[in-house]
């Protein structure tokens, strides 16, 4: 066991024993000599230091007592460190003083008294373990340097020989060799020493890379912890406050007010934020371009956020815009059909046939589609107001989506009082009101319109901005189809529009006999969509495409008839079709007694302030001289009632008692004495009623005015339907019209006779 613990090299090691106890020195020396041949002992520490300095290479182990007197621990340890000699301490049985910490830390092992042979044997493993490690490190370093030097020298010598061979073979003269050669080993060592100095003074490339990598790791960790979610939210809030065009790193940092951030850090984060926004904006348009035909741009009048109430309005607007888009696409293929003219013979065949008092069907006669596809239209018999022009017809459309207004002389035939139509630019009449006229009963002719050929594309589109006339999409019928029909009449009828004209276009220049025609319609509203009762000057002219002239044979020829701004030939006038319920209606709700049945055109107008009558045959010279004011040249006392061929116009005050009107006697006053009449004539003398008008129906009235049943083709059929509606029906919106067809051949024959 002892032989295994004690190394073989222990015999060559010199041991120095330092102890002031002579007995202890003797016993230890005898035991140490068993393992080592050279053992030296001293009793004073100073002698030991001198021996260490003199025999620095011979002493390999020092064993010292920690309680030696006169020992300087500092000097003793310095000597041991310089010599690099292992130290073993001996601890006494009774410690009189504490050993130095430096000595205990420096010592390899400690022996406690009494010391035995086993302790000496175990001591050697601690001594040689430390010494062998130090020697091994030194030997490895020296061996490596020697090997590298030898290999490098051989390589350099080989290169030099190779270079010399190349130069000799090429027989090149005057050229310096590529590589410096080392002729001797001394020159190589000199070159190596210079390279080592340079390598030690300048850091290598690998070390720089490693240092940069460590710094980068630290910066990445610091960067991740720098921009957390809270700071990023502050960053976004600062950008939203400054705006997309005005944000800068400095201004963002001022708003964030974070002392841990620098201007450079905010700028770097802002640059990354912009890059992300650009990438998103580049990706979205590219995806949208793939399905550009299938996408629909939401209008600007959508209401946000999408609440329940807003979603309904948005859906209505979206559906209406989609419907208009589909109809434009369906009509795009039929635009070229407007570019040609049909011959006269074909026009006569396709010319619409009209029957007064019956239903109309324009679907078979249309060249460019229906007027308003699947939309009911009303023909209202509206009396004239002040002039002697007979009553005329107005095509109107039931539209409950137009805002209400209180215009004088306007009548809503299919609407409630709350949804009266608005007509901008229409002149008002003195003494007339919308309330009064809305109480009148009227007769309407139902004109159902539908498209018999659903496969045929529509030939024209009525392009109307729905939002400009404030339409309520929820109240529009499902059959609404804004198509316009153009009624082509004969070219020789000068009062009809030109067949080549655009749909619903009126030539203002041709209307020279009425100067105010520009004010009859608003550019944003289709006049065919409204029911209106004209006032004093609201005449629908024969020159427009809104009226159809009805020439009659049995009309009293009275020549020129006075209007407000000019004279209209009598042959161009529309025959009067008087609704008896229109006559004599005032604010008080009373009725006027009927008049005599004469071959005259009876026109009724109601006012709450004025009452006047106009004879048909007047002295034109007198009228021209008194024409300065259309309402001042006729006075109540100047009005006469001729025996024959009179056109009576009654304006009754709302305060007049109608019971005394039965006894009225027509005045026989000469028109030349109009200006000499007194102003105090009672109103009972102004109006005469001879017959009971309630006993007259539409058929008897037509016979009296020259419209026989043979001429006007008034045979009863399942397609003829005349609706007589009263005030309560006019105030409602739920009017439903039957979809029947009819042909008004009488209009065609009457117009052909004039040719």
Curated annotation (Swiss-Prot):
Protein name per Swiss-Prot or TrEMBL? Putative two-component response regulator-like APRR6
Tell me which SUPFAM superfamilies the record gives.
Answer: CheY-like, Homeodomain-like
Which organism was this protein described from? Arabidopsis thaliana
Record-annotated disulphide pairs:
none
| Gene Ontology MF term list | DNA binding
Similarity comment: family membership: Belongs to the ARR-like family.
Q: Where is the Response regulatory domain?
A: 14-128
Give the UniProt subcellular location, in the record's own words: Nucleus
Under the heading NCBIfam families, the entry gives: myb_SHAQKYF
Keywords in alphabetical order, please: Nucleus, Transcription, Transcription regulation, Two-component regulatory system
> Which is a GO BP term held by this UniProt record?
phosphorelay signal transduction system
